[in-house]
């Protein structure tokens, strides 16, 4: 008759082995789950949109595509708009401004002003949740310019209905329209900046003189929220989106990567046109009708 050796019995050893095996399987499952989740769940992104040329209808087209892509991309949790522009066409600027406001309703948007963010470019920036700028960034120039076509005499064979069919109105009426657009620009800046984290300190009249300010002054007057780098703006967007781990991406690159075939080809051609567009000329002989601009245009 044999006796069990001192220590654990076979039954006890079997139970211990099962526990160890179960623990190993649990650890392996956790590790596998981690790597699986890492591969299947996309890393949250902060998307960067660059506005680095004059504001035109062509730019409006590309900005519309990028803003819509950023708005609809589930993995893009926040957006930084890097702005370096003297402004441009009033209508194109208004369109981009309204789109930025819509974007901020779905995810945080931070404007990062580079060397120059003037006129329409500044208005686009005030559509963001917050504005960052460098101490030497040029900010402001809130006003409107009207570009007139070269005067031409109507042919005697040209017949029009009504006294203003050819001209659109009197010189006085055009000036009144200019004043209306100026007031609208001023009011949009005052409304947006009055509720900003660093609220506006200037009166509506002081805002709308067309003056420019450097970033240090703009911070003091409440035209921007913080002095800081592009990286600071990105970190702020991530903070507002409650992100600690994230990837920074160029929205243009992400958008183009989503296209194929003819759609990609036509879009690349559009971007090429934007990158090579000539500077706006308010007195061009090719201008067919008066046009309103929100453009920083230093007089020579």
For every predicted segment, state its role:
Residues 93-96, 118, 211-212:
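Generic non-transmembrane alpha-helix signal with a bias for helix starts/N-cap capping motifs
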